[in-house]
């Protein structure tokens, strides 16, 4: 982290348990970010919070430190059974759940507390084996958590800490009934520490907090501007005929170290991926129907730099912590203004600068006024020279489906099997920076 992203508040001065501090120190976390500096004193005093902070502000570490600290300082309920976790952390997507677990690993090692994951897209047996051995902290998505509950693998009667991350996204994805199902099977709000985090504390999010929390304190950390002052924004108005050529031309000009391209539909993502893969870029595809193991592999390759470009739907826009993303391309302007902020928030994180390039095309330019109203500024517009666009580009690679007979009995849930091939397009030599 750079100094611009942290405060003078040190974790060591907050009164955290030594084992928790050891876990933080192991990852090099010494000073707090603003959300950590505001939230942790409240949580360590035993007060519930409803926190407003965007992804990339350090909120995950705030609720993890508070969760582990509370479990270390609070006796387990008398007569607690092996099927009863003491803390539950709910996330809207499996990628976010996995990321939270990964962020918790140093605290798991330093405290000796046991944690497990529960999310869809992976076979029950592997997750069930870990859960059956007994866990202190269960991290996952609501659907799979409820499945384990209904099978009698877990119950919520010994819950002492609850975390609801990306609460606004939970509403967007229609998970609110699942959330209430879980909450209503726990001890009363006064008997547990409750944390809710959301990019926006809308009326519906605050209503949820009022219903299932004990007089939560509102902790708000808002950036100077919604899109982050370290992100350079740029807007083009391409025709539909020029859109793909403009994208490939800009990639050739910018040659980003690590870029995410967002499109609004799975079909459009596959089309963009096909063009870039045919042009020998090292590109990965992340959409909702990519099998979980493949998703994890793609994200790992992208994080390690083995893949330079990730083409994604908004499934990747929230919660994923991928450091050093240099460019975000909005191939399609999102239909929801808030998603623009979440998308470009993949870059310009932790004090780093970033670039956002958006296309206001014939189909999605209608979304621009709402986006600019929401971010409270106009996106700087750039023109392009049609004669300078790349020509003679190869035909896109088409993703192929398995023959229908090979997809029976849920063998691959109808997922596309090709794609995400690793390409080795040589990078051009970088010109000296002016």
Curated annotation (Swiss-Prot):
SMART domains per the UniProt record, alphabetical: DEXDc (SM00487), HELICc (SM00490)
GO terms for cellular component: cytosol
Compositional bias per record (Low complexity), positions renumbered to this chain: 406-418
Principal location listed in the UniProt entry: cytoplasm
Catalytically driven reaction(s): ATP + H2O = ADP + phosphate + H(+)
A Pfam family of this chain: DEAD
Enzyme class: hydrolase
Disordered as annotated region, ranges: 394-434
UniProt motif (Q motif) ranges: 9-37
Keywords: ATP-binding, Cytoplasm, Helicase, Hydrolase, Nucleotide-binding, RNA-binding
Biased composition (Basic residues): 419-428
Role this protein plays: DEAD-box RNA helicase involved in RNA degradation. Has RNA-dependent ATPase activity and unwinds double-stranded RNA.
Quaternary structure note: Component of the RNA degradosome, which is a multiprotein complex involved in RNA processing and mRNA degradation.
Family: Belongs to the DEAD box helicase family. RhlB subfamily.
The protein's name in its UniProt record: ATP-dependent RNA helicase RhlB
Source organism of this protein record: Aliivibrio salmonicida (strain LFI1238) (Vibrio salmonicida (strain LFI1238))
Gene name per UniProt: rhlB
């Amino acid at each position: 982290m750079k100094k611009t992203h942290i405060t003078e508040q040190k974790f060591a001065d907050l009164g955290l348990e030594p084992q928790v501090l050891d876990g933080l120190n192991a990852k090099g976390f010494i000073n707090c970010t603003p959300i950590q500096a505001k939230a942790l004193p409240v949580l360590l005093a035993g007060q519930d919070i409803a926190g407003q902070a965007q992804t990339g502000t350090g909120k995950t570490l705030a609720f993890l430190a508070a969760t582990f600290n509370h479990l270390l300082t609070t006796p387990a309920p008398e007569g607690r059974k092996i099927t009863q976790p003491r803390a539950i952390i709910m996330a809207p997507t499996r990628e976010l759940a996995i990321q939270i677990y990964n962020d918790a690993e140093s605290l798991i090692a330093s405290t000796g507390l046991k944690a497990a994951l529960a999310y869809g897209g992976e076979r029950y047996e592997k997750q069930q084996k870990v859960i059956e051995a007994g866990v202190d902290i269960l991290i996952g998505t609501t659907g799979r958590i409820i499945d384990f509950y209904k099978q009698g693998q877990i119950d919520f009667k010994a819950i002492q800490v609850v975390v609801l991350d990306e609460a606004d996204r939970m509403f967007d994805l229609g998970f609110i009934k699942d959330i209430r199902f879980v909450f209503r099977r726990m001890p009363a709000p006064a008997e547990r520490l409750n944390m809710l985090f959301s990019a926006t504390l809308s009326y519906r999010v605050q209503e949820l907090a009022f219903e299932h929390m004990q007089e939560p304190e509102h902790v708000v950390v808002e950036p100077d501007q919604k899109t982050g002052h370290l992100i350079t924004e740029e807007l083009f108005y391409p025709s539909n005929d020029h859109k793909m050529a403009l994208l490939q031309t800009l990639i050739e000009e910018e040659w980003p170290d690590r870029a995410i391209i967002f499109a609004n539909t799975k079909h459009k993502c596959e089309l963009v991926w096909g063009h870039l893969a045919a042009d020998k870029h090292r590109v990965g595809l992340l959409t909702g129907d990519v099998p979980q193991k493949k998703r994890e592999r793609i994200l790992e390759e992208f994080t390690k730099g083995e893949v330079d470009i990730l083409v994604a739907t908004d499934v990747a826009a929230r919660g994923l912590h991928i450091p050093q993303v240099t460019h975000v391309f909005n191939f399609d302007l999102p239909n929801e203004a808030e998603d623009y902020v979440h998308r470009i928030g993949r870059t310009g994180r932790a004090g780093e600068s970033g670039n956002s390039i958006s296309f206001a095309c014939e189909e999605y330019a209608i979304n621009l006024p709402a986006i600019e109203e929401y971010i409270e500024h106009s996106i700087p517009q750039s023109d392009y020279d049609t004669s300078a666009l790349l020509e003679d580009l190869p035909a896109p690679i088409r993703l192929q489906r398995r023959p229908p007979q090979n997809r029976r009995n849920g063998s691959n849930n109808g997922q596309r099997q090709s794609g995400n091939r690793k390409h080795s397009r040589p990078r051009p030599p970088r010109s000296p920076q002016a």
